[in-house]
Amino acid sequence: MSRKYFGTDGIRGRANGLITPELALKVGQAAGLAFQRGDHRHRVVIGKDTRLSGYMIEYAMVAGFTSVGMDVLLVGPMPTPAVAMLTKSMRADLGVMISASHNLFEDNGIKLFGPQGFKLSDDVEKQIEQLLDEPIDKRLAQSASLGRARRIDGVHDRYIEFAKRTLPRDLSLDGLRVVVDCANGAAYKVVPEALWELGADVVPIGVEPDGFNINKDCGSTSPEALSKKVREMRADIGIALDGDADRVILVDERGHVVDGDQLLAVIAQSWKEDGRLSRPGIVATVMSNLGLERFLKGQGLDLVRTPVGDRYVLEQMLSGGYNLGGEQSGHIILSDYATTGDGFVAALQVLAVVQKSRRPVSEVCHRFDPLPQILKNVRHKGGKPLDDSDVKSAISDGEKRLNGHGRLLIRSSGTEPVIRVMGEGEDRILVEDVVDTIVSALGQAAA
């Protein structure tokens, strides 16, 4: 059974396009019914980021959950990993994050977490999809059994304390000037406060959300503003989160971007030296640079690859017994601490290495020279452009031209109508030409 609503990271789409109040109401009802197990009073934690449509989706979901007898705990704007953590710590049956992650404000989405704070399995999502398409009038709660909703205070402090506990008690960030870009998103209150409490000299940007400016020319997908601010303030490091703070990109003191592959290399080597890796290896996706794989091999560590999506990274980590994994895009999963990607906690692990080494970030965070990698996106209006004969021919020709000295990865995005074309190899000019040829063919097929 193919999935109708769920993509690789929950349900996501244009606000009042795919993501309507009606859909949010039905998702609340369907998920509420799916997670009502046993006779106890059931409850759900709902968080959101700062986009304008969050209010609309939040209230519709409250109506859905309460209509099937589930109590709702509202925590307001909070990072996705904080919602996952709170779901578990507050003994809730379900967690919801209303966010479209790194997308602009026009989009929104619904991410669901089980009682242990993990994203739902494909099977559970399919069960919810079946309920979405079934009439549930006869399964609504009786008047006396309707759910209640309340806003919870103090949740910011809970997450701040959780994040601080991932560092040794004797480690302070004193002496570090840190510019942090919260993308005008969910972390705009908690992360600057946590850094200040840890002793850093904090310069916050992207902390003035207005409902429209989330991820707009800021955050992990647009680190240019952060790079400029780091140089301007002569800071030691810059931290760029995305709209829901489940991914992170760093900037060194020179303003150069440090991607998720380099972060994985830093943490992997540090944890190996400290004996903290549960297995001699880490998990990453097919998008991670071959340079990372070669670096890890030199450290005696394996790299296990998965399809794109942090959920698949986590599944492999759990099944294989790994405690470190992530994506080049900055989703870093540290399963000793969190059940999902946590951009801030990942940044803290790197800051710990910087403090211990007393070396510049540009030295600490450059563990390998990445192979030239070209990634381009082709937006389409539907259909199957990858099945076009000219596209297939361009891909086949490209693979022959790389001839074992590089690789191609062409895939449809699981979160938006985009086909991603990635080429990697030792000859940058050749890789660019191969990718451009495929992108041109896709553009004509998608027109």
From Swiss-Prot:
Print the keywords alphabetically: Isomerase, Magnesium, Metal-binding, Phosphoprotein
Is Phosphoprotein included in the keywords of this UniProt record? yes
Gene Ontology molecular-function annotations: magnesium ion binding; phosphoglucosamine mutase activity; phosphomannomutase activity
UniProt catalytic activity: alpha-D-glucosamine 1-phosphate = D-glucosamine 6-phosphate
Task: Name one process (GO BP) from the record.
Answer: peptidoglycan biosynthetic process
Catalytic residues? Answer: 101
| Matches recorded under InterPro entries | A-D-PHexomutase_a/b/a-I, A-D-PHexomutase_a/b/a-I/II/III, A-D-PHexomutase_a/b/a-II, A-D-PHexomutase_a/b/a-III, A-D-PHexomutase_C, A-D-PHexomutase_C_sf, Alpha-D-phosphohexomutase_SF, GlmM_bact
**What cofactor requirement does the entry state?**
Mg(2+)
Is the keyword Isomerase in the record? Answer: yes
What is the top-level taxon of the source organism?
Answer: Bacteria
What family does the database annotate? Answer: Belongs to the phosphohexose mutase family.
Tell me the HAMAP family matching this sequence.
Answer: GlmM_B
Identification of the protein by name: Phosphoglucosamine mutase
User: Which organism does this record belong to?
Assistant: Bradyrhizobium diazoefficiens (strain JCM 10833 / BCRC 13528 / IAM 13628 / NBRC 14792 / USDA 110)
In the UniProt record, the gene name given for this protein reads: glmM
